[in-house]
A protein has these predicted regions:
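Divalent metal-dependent hydrolysis catalytic cores, especially in the metallo-beta-lactamase
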Residues: 50-71, 131-134
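Charged catalytic cores and adjacent phosphate/nucleic-acid-binding surfaces used
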Residues: 2-53, 71-80, 86-87, 92-93, ...
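Acidic/Gly/His-enriched mid-domain segments of enzyme catalytic cores or analogous surface patches
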Residues: 136-140
Length: 298
């Protein structure tokens, strides 16, 4: 079941989520399966800022899907454990992979999948790690990095797609999300909503409410009862990715590492305290030739 709802809905859901204190007490999971942090060149969102905002807005499960690396997701997972909130925020290791056919997302990964493989090869690599294959923003014409129609159909016909984004907050026009929903229905692929957030403002713009899950099998079962809630980001949000790209380029030239958002904003739980964050060096980030990283359409 899918539900499109205004941003006000997430405030109500956040209030419901905050009533729970541990994973066993969660009757529902509130999940976002497509989020970027500073380990994507087009984001400056730090691990701690991300965790603060995600908890404040009521998310319980997040798939961190940086461009062409899982190290960013590992950094969020480790920071959540360090802050003592990993029992309240389940961090799923993910990656948005730049394939030769367009972007494919893998979640529940163990290690980075190399860029440049075909979409089918990438799907096989994701499955080999015990992960799930998700297709992000498949029909957004403003993002040349999206997967092309022919390889998308081949993946679907081969049964190699586990999830498809039927609502992506960064898709400008509703008809392109609707096209994704129709494609998912045609091939009977579970649909999800995703914020595709690259900044703290966007976190939980879209999310999925479903029975709580802790692993791939439980998620696949929970998807049958998923109710997704979607709100579109303003088109101006793409300026934040452009700012992030150029900030990181300039800081790289100056030898100052990567930029990060200030650790300010919504009040975090008492046990979450602001601490200095060591930013990765430019060499540790994905290749700036990444078409997604070099575009202002993140």
């Amino acid at each position: 079941m899918t539900v499109s709802a205004p941003a006000a809905t997430r405030a109500a859901v956040a209030g419901m989520a905050r009533e729970r204190t541990g994973p066993r007490e969660r009757a529902l999971a509130f999940a976002d399966f497509h989020i970027h942090t500073r380990f994507s060149r087009d984001s400056i969102l730090s691990e701690e800022k991300f965790i603060r905002v995600a908890l404040d807005r009521g998310l319980t499960h997040v798939a961190v899907t940086n461009h062409n690396n899982v190290e960013g997701a590992m950094a969020v997972r480790d920071k959540a454990a360090e802050l003592g909130v990993d029992d309240r925020l389940t961090v799923i290791l993910g990656e948005e992979v730049s394939t030769s056919d367009g972007e494919v997302v893998g979640i529940f990964l163990q290690r980075t999948i190399p860029r440049g493989l075909t979409a089918a090869e990438t799907a096989d690599e994701i499955r080999a790690q015990g992960g799930l294959v998700s297709v992000p923003h498949p029909f957004d014409p403003f993002r040349p990095s999206h997967i092309r129609r022919e390889p998308l159909e081949r993946l679907a016909e081969a049964g190699k797609i586990d999830l498809i984004e039927v609502f992506n907050s960064r898709v400008t026009f509703h008809r392109h999300n609707q096209e994704a929903a129709e494609f998912a229905a045609r091939y009977e692929i579970p649909g999800i909503a995703a914020s595709d957030s690259h900044s703290s403002f966007e976190i939980a713009m879209s999310f999925n409410a479903m029975p709580a899950f802790e692993n791939v099998d439980e998620l696949e079962a929970a998807l049958a009862q998923n109710e997704w809630h979607g709100s579109r980001s303003t088109v101006l949000i793409h300026l934040t990715t452009r700012y992030a790209v150029w900030s990181n380029i300039v800081r790289g030239w100056l030898g100052k590492g990567t930029a990060t958002e200030p650790i300010l904003g919504p009040e975090a739980p008492a046990e979450v305290k602001a601490e200095p964050i060591e930013a990765p060096t430019p060499e540790e980030l994905p290749d700036p030739g990444d078409p997604e990283a070099s575009s202002d359409r993140g």
